[in-house]
Design a protein with these regions (language model features):
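A non-catalytic alpha/beta surface segment that caps or lines the substrate-entry region
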Residues: 23-126, 148-180, 185-192
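Acidic/histidine-rich catalytic neighborhood of metal-dependent amide-processing enzymes
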Residues: 91-94, 98-122, 130, 143-148, ...
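Proline/glycine-enriched tight loop/beta-turn segments at coil->beta junctions
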Residues: 127-135
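Active-site-adjacent substrate-binding region
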Residues: 23, 53-55, 291-399
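Extracytoplasmic/secreted proteins, especially bacterial periplasmic and envelope-associated proteins
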Residues: 9-12, 16, 33, 37, ...
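N-terminal capping segment at the start of a domain
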Residues: 1-30, 45, 208-213, 362-372, ...
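A composition-biased, non-transmembrane "mature-region" signal
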Residues: 3, 7, 32, 36, ...
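Hydrophobic/aromatic beta-strand patches that form the interior of the parallel beta-sheet core
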Residues: 135-137, 252, 281-283, 349-353
Length: 399
């Protein structure tokens, strides 16, 4: 495998698509056009290629944020009118929405947002012999809303987000206290003032996300590009008579990852029966910026969905044999999710390779900002991803 040539191809593809289509919010014309361009290339080498259109409700995934602020303001009003039950209900409602919409990525608010068409694209490269397993190589081509908190005072990100949620929890608890002790005027006044001051923190969440999108180079067009180059590589080997014997390759570029993993969900739902018929492994990629920060996820979706720990450990061992330093890591609570979660829910053995710090306190300084450009993606991290995944696929094909 000519790593330098493949890496060059990966970068040129990403550069071309960003230059042609720009930022790509799911469901926009730019997003669909980028998907079509990826599909056109996949169709040149895949044995079978396909587009999967589905609907996304634009803006719904982050809709819980402003609802949280609105419910908090309503709670304050109820408190000042000495109606703690109303404040309690407002706080509990906002926490329910937060839990279902963000912690679990359920489509609670979708019906209230504009319905747009989105598009997954993928291709299949068959092995030379009987299919005994299939491997999904995946990234996503949509880009994220700009997160203003990562631009303005990013060191306060954790305080602003986690602190805001904690303040809403305080609204619930203190409202409950007032229901238990309704006849203590000083207690009532103190709680009213404390919760009102909390609006200074919670109110900032209204401005959490910008209407504009990032260029989306590292998050996550480069991953889709790596998947395509690996697909072309395996097709080329087969054409030379050196192809995979029993392993089918599926090259996948999901849409709407940034809208709550909706593209991966649509794909996993449609092909769930195929996953049962043929043992399926998912090699997902996301946020590949820095080779010094490489790790494989063992859980996803705010740590609510378990990924395949054995697969992650096997990939770490492969990387070690290639002198590439990696590790395994759980998805931290409140840090979101990747497309691997939706595949795991349908029984796919899957992990995600990530190349940046992934905690509430530390992320790449270009993540979800206008600076998510190709020059921020390390050449080495792309070569490492290519090396690890092709080596692993060759290894399992020999089993």
């Amino acid at each position: 495998m000519d790593l330098k040539s493949m890496r060059f191809e990966v970068f040129k593809r990403v550069e071309r698509i960003i230059k042609t289509h720009g930022p790509r919010l799911a469901g926009t014309k730019a997003d669909l056009a980028a998907a079509d361009e990826l599909y056109d290339e996949i169709a040149t080498f895949a044995d079978h290629s396909s587009k999967q259109d589905f609907f996304v409700y634009q803006g719904a995934f982050l809709g819980w944020i402003r609802l949280l602020v609105i419910c908090y303001v309503i709670g304050i009003i109820f408190l000042w009118f000495n109606l703690p039950l109303g404040a309690l209900i407002a706080g509990v409602l906002s926490l329910i929405i937060l839990t279902l919409q963000f912690f679990l990525y359920l489509p609670l608010l979708d019906r209230f947002y504009p319905k747009k068409k989105a598009r997954n694209v993928f291709g299949i490269i068959e092995p030379s012999g009987e299919v005994k397993r299939q491997v999904i190589l995946s990234g996503h081509h949509d880009s994220a809303h700009i997160f203003n908190f990562f631009i303005h005072q990013p060191k306060l990100y954790n305080l602003r987000t986690t602190g805001s949620i904690a303040t809403v929890i305080a609204l619930v608890l203190l409202s409950a206290i007032l229901l238990i002790f309704p006849t203590i005027p000083l207690l009532t006044l103190v709680i009213q003032i404390v919760i009102s001051l909390g609006l200074l923190l919670v109110g900032q969440m209204w401005f959490f996300a910008d209407k504009n999108a990032t260029p989306g180079a590292g998050d996550n067009l480069v991953a889709s590009s790596i998947a395509i180059s690996l697909g072309k590589h395996f097709k080329h080997l087969r054409d030379q008579g050196k192809g995979l014997e029993n392993t089918r390759i599926i090259v996948m570029s999901f849409d709407a990852e940034e809208e709550g993993l909706r593209g991966a969900r649509a794909y996993a739902k449609k092909y769930a029966n195929e996953f049962k018929k043929t043992p399926t492994i998912g090699l997902n990629m996301d946020c590949l910026y820095d080779e010094k920060e490489l790790f494989f996820l063992t859980s996803d979706l705010n740590d609510f969905v378990k990924l395949d720990s054995q697969l992650a450990n096997d990939l770490v061992a492969i990387a070690k044999g290639l002198n590439i330093e990696t590790k395994t890591q759980k998805q931290a609570f409140l840090t979101g999710g990747t497309d691997a979660a939706e595949l795991a829910k349908k029984g796919v053995k899957v992990t995600t390779l990530i190349g940046m710090p992934w905690t509430n306190d530390s992320r790449s300084n270009v993540y979800h900002t206008p600076n998510d450009t190709l020059d921020r993606v390390s050449e080495k991290v792309v070569e490492d991803a290519l090396s690890i995944y092709q080596a692993y696929i060759h290894q399992i094909d020999q089993q």
